[in-house]
Amino acid sequence: PVQAARVALATRGDASIAADLHATRDGVSLAARNATLAHARVIATPPAAQARPSTPAIDIALSGTLTLRGTLHDADGDGRRIEGTSVALANGMPVIVDTRQPQRAVPNALLASDAGLYAASQPISIRAAGLRNEGGAIDSTGTGQGHIGLRIGGPAVNLGYIATHGTLEATVDGTLENRMLLSAAALRVATHDLSNHAAMTASGPDTGTPALDLSVQHRVENAGSLLAARGALRLRGGAELSIVNQPAGFMLAHGQDIAAARLANAGTLSSTAAG
């Protein structure tokens, strides 16, 4: 592991990170063509007094693809791995359950991964031509309001999790394939096509715009949950937008504004969110 007050990496070629990088004061910046984190974490923990809401604690700028290769696991409040657990959906929300008693949620358990970007309560900014999150984490949860901004010029595959206590904004010019996008405040996504396998959740109230605000140009395939726990869901897009809500799909919110050329619903649509 490498620990320093600030970590700044810049290369015209590719960057491969296979050991943890920890910035304790001024954050982390990475500029490269492609970047891969293989079972390694980039961690930024600037003191709260020095943190600036407009300055990312982790700032990634790539002309190519960001790839995270890791293993999801569950952890306690101190980051220690909890064995014998898995992630399930309950009323549209991801919960960590005991594999021996699948109906029992494990109290105080948190999602984690051995690969990813961690900036507790601080902003994370990612600009890249592509994203492949294979079991990794992009995480700015904590006691503050750190937000996450993603600007992806092509496709984005999120088979890990992306989570923040602040606003999560993602613009994807290609197809977004998602497992878990989680915001304790607002979630705003703009993409060409959306394939949601598990959870896209916004747990905060509306703040002038709907808490869960989705703009999809062409097609939505939902086999998981689109959940606004305390606010509204807005789902709009191009003139030919097609929405398919599969049998396992949930669209749950306190009010829905859905406009599409075609809507095929075999799942659940509800204007009152669970919880």
Model feature map: region roles:
Residues P1-G275:
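Low-complexity, glycine- and small/polar-enriched segments
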